[in-house]
Amino acid sequence: MSYEKVLQAGKIVIGTKQTIRALKEGEATEVIVAEDADLPIIEKVTAAANEANVPVTKVDSMKKLGKACKIQVGAAAVAILR
């Protein structure tokens, strides 16, 4: 499951802006997006990932994604770094 990938990942960035920055800089190997995030956010992150040829995995909950990142709030997007 993708939540476990986030937990086991060595380096991650949390949040839409940081995820898009990591994609543009070629640092991301995979992107995790929460399906309950706002649609424009999902579309923006997915488009940036497609442009960078980075796979996108969708999970059901921002809250669970945030918890997997060990933060107390939800996370719309997370990038796993090289």
From Swiss-Prot:
Keyword Protease listed: no
Gene3D superfamilies cross-referenced by the UniProt entry: 3.30.1330.30
InterPro entries per UniProt: Ribosomal_eL30-like_sf (IPR029064), Ribosomal_eL8/eL30/eS12/Gad45 (IPR004038), RNA_bf_YbxF-like (IPR023460)
Coiled-coil portions: none
GO molecular function annotations of the record: RNA binding
Keywords: RNA-binding
Alphabetical list of HAMAP family matching this protein: Ribosomal_eL8_Bact
Family: Belongs to the eukaryotic ribosomal protein eL8 family.
NCBIfam families xref list: PRK13602.1
UniProt-recorded name of the protein: RNA-binding protein YbxF
The species this protein was found in: Geobacillus stearothermophilus
Lineage, highest ranks first: Bacteria, Bacillati, Bacillota, Bacilli, Bacillales
